[in-house]
């Protein structure tokens, strides 16, 4: 079984805190960390979004002060503050979710995307290497590696196969630095041709698969996990996962039965 614990433009420091939070209730054998975050700015509007969905704990409180901007902290420390003039439109569901949290996700953290963006060319993503930022991110990658070692978890830093990628030079730097930390690094763009991806139907935008591409990559990734001696967990909630399979299958069948919809996504999503 697996779960997606990722948000938009998730930085490496936030990934560290997300991992600690996840491991407070879960015992993963392996974690995959998307390495593009090594080049993200230390702050963007997505930092608040990513922190908002974390349960209350030190793993949310610490990055609220170290990663969020000063004007975002009040809304993160006191979430109802963020409602401002919307108080009279709040429902019991709003309060209960804030207090009790959310129900189990029927897609285990995955976002089902059925629209497609036809891709014409594969390009380098225009990252600018900022040494101070990269160095800080590398320190957090080292903290992730150390935490995983304590918990007997295999960490795998990887690049998702897509059509807007870090340059060969930056990819080589990632490989060298992750190997220096003694952790696995996989560039799945190297397996791009093996995935039998259709550039006209399998991407939502230049950076993300839709469900068609995700199915192909997931099958490839599942077969590769066997290389690490991993086997499916026998401790999972079988009924919950069967329901998730039924839910995903229903969405897939509905999308497969109709024409391919265009996503209208921009050429270079931010």
Set out the residue ranges of the language-model regions.
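C-terminal regions of proteins
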Residues: 172-267
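Secreted/periplasmic serine-hydrolase-like ester/acetyl group-modifying domain
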Residues: 46-154, 234-270
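Active-site-proximal beta-strand/loop segments in catalytic clefts of secreted hydrolases
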Residues: 5-8, 34-36, 158-162, 188-191, ...
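Acidic-and-aromatic substrate-binding clefts and catalytic sites of carbohydrate-active enzymes
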Residues: 9-13, 133-135, 161-170
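Sec-exported extracytoplasmic/periplasmic mature domains
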Residues: 20, 24, 146-150, 222, ...
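Loop/turn elements at helix/coil->beta-strand transitions in domains of secreted/extracellular proteins
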Residues: 27-30, 149-156, 181-184
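Extracytoplasmic/secreted proteins, especially bacterial periplasmic and envelope-associated proteins
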Residues: 14-17, 60, 73-82, 136-143, ...
């Amino acid at each position: 079984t697996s779960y997606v614990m990722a948000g938009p433009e998730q930085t490496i420091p936030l990934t560290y805190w997300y991992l600690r939070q996840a491991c407070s209730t879960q015992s993963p054998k392996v974690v995959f960390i998307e390495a593009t975050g090594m080049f993200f700015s230390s702050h963007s509007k997505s930092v608040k979004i990513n922190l908002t969905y974390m349960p209350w704990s030190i793993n949310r409180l610490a990055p609220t002060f170290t990663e969020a901007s000063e004007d975002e902290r009040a809304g993160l420390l006191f979430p109802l503050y963020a409602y401002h003039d919307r108080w009279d439109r709040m429902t019991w569901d709003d309060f209960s979710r804030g207090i009790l949290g959310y129900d189990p996700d029927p897609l285990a953290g995955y976002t089902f995307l059925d629209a497609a963006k036809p891709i014409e060319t594969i390009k380098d993503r225009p990252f600018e290497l900022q040494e101070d930022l990269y160095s800080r991110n590398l320190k957090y990658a080292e903290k992730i590696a150390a935490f995983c070692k304590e918990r007997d978890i295999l960490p795998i830093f990887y690049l998702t196969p897509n059509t807007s990628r870090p340059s060969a030079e930056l990819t080589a730097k990632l490989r060298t630095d992750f190997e220096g930390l003694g952790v696995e690094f996989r560039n799945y763009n190297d397996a791009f041709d093996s995935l039998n991806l259709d550039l006209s139907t399998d991407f939502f935008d230049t950076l993300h698969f839709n469900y068609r591409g995700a199915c192909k990559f997931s099958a490839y990734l599942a077969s590769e996990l066997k290389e690490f001696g991993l086997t499916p967990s026998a401790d999972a909630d079988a009924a919950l996962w069967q329901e998730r399979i039924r839910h995903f299958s229903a969405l897939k069948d509905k999308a497969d039965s109709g024409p391919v919809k265009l996503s209208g996504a921009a050429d270079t999503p931010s």
